[in-house]
Amino acid sequence: MTSQELKAAAKSFGADLVGIASTASLAYLPKEDNPLSIFPQAKNVIIIGRKIPRGALRGIEQGTEMDNSFAQFGFIDLEDNFLAKTTYDVNIWMEARGFEAVPLFAYDCTGQPVGVPVEPGKPAPNVILQYRIMAQAAGLGETGLNGLFLTPEFGPRQRFAMLLTDAEMKADKPFQPYLCKDCGKCVPACPLQALSPENGTKAGFAGCESLVAARDNDLCRRCRNGAFVTNEGRFSTVERVAAACSRACIAALEERGATQEKITHPFRQSAPWGRDIVGDKVQ
């Protein structure tokens, strides 16, 4: 099985994005973040992405519909049904060809507490891979200033899953950042001023890092501008793809022609709206 055959199969099962990262390139990661802690025989990590329809953000962008479209087609159903089905189908396709693959959702576990190793030298449970590093290692994109993962195809509009496999294939080259360019449009777009580039840090795959602004998670949890807190199954993190910071990013990337997907009318068709921490309108 070649990487081209794998990618063609994934696309036939509905994947919009497919990348491959070798586990050897990820050997520098600590045990708690390393795919080999889950599957020591793995040779590659396959990253599968499905895009978030731009239309799923239309209601939030214009302040007309805040829950149904994005919550289902941009997040919950997209991850739990459409992306899961694509990943499952690729998994079964690989096993039918004699290769094992471990399927994993790409959940954000930033800041979550870890357990205690069962013995010295073992990773602290639970091992949950940093999907942004995996996706960048697989050549799919970069982490932007706002902390969201950006691809050349869709900007921040995608969801990811992963397969750890013992199949030996040609891996993709890591993605060198060029999309965000620290344009900074996300920073003033946040009515709560939750992003602080001056206190930011470098993040990403080793040698391909980019600046990520410090973020006040407590403010994000109280955001009334398209963000919402996920359930415990997703570690109660803040989902921000529809938030003001992300929508400003989508508009900025489109305006300078940085995203490959072209849609007839621009994403931003009117002045952005915003609400402060108590829900009052802001200019």
What residue ranges belong to the model's regions?
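Non-catalytic, usually N-terminal nucleic-acid engagement modules in DNA/RNA processing proteins
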Residues: M1-L83
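Catalytic cores of enzyme domains
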Residues: L29, Q72-G274
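Long, internal scaffold/assembly segments composed of regular secondary structure
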Residues: I277-V282
